[in-house]
């Protein structure tokens, strides 16, 4: 389990564990944005967990890793950290975060690399949503609905709205729809 110490915060974690979470979340990071802070990962340490969040104009995704922490911390980490981690073999990493100057030092066996983080305050906050309708379903039923229409979703960077599945509720049912512009699923 990763550990975090006082002073300059230290996160010890498996390279593959961290890389897997960052790669999952990287799909949400825009290549260009009018809000540059969303081109970063948000690292938050709360209640013994490291939460990693990405956001764009359409939403946000959060993943978490267990850790031991003596205090909470929040910092934005450049997406370029992913490129540095990809080149390393599996090994324990020690990530040192200086909350004062936002410097981030990643040490590994035989080397280190540094990046400069950013204050987390400008990162988009989670929006509070009003629950208008509630339908209960199992994860298996939900996954089944998505798997039936996902093949109809496009993978087109020029029309990102076609790269998704629309989920609507009507009369107590969940309706899953996707389209690539040629077929409807």
Model-predicted segments: where are they?
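Structural preference for solvent-exposed beta-strand-turn elements
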Residues: 1-185
């Amino acid at each position: 389990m990763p550990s975090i110490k006082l002073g300059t915060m230290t996160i010890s974690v498996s390279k593959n564990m961290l890389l897997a979470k960052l790669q999952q979340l990287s799909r949400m990071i825009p290549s260009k944005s009018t809000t540059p802070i969303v081109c970063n990962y948000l690292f938050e340490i709360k209640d013994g967990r490291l939460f990693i969040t990405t956001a764009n104009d359409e939403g946000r995704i959060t993943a978490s890793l267990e850790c031991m922490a003596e205090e909470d911390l929040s910092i934005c980490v450049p997406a370029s950290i992913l490129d540095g981690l990809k080149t390393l073999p599996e090994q324990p990493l020690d990530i040192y975060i200086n909350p004062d100057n936002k410097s981030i030092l990643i040490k590994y066996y035989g080397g280190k690399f540094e990046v400069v983080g950013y204050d987390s305050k400008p990162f988009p906050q989670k929006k509070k949503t009003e629950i208008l309708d509630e339908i209960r379903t199992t994860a298996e039923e939900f996954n089944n609905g998505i798997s039936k229409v996902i093949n109809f979703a496009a993978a087109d960077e020029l029309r990102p709205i076609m790269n998704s599945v629309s989920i609507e509720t009507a009369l107590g049912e969940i309706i899953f729809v996707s389209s690539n512009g040629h077929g409807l699923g």
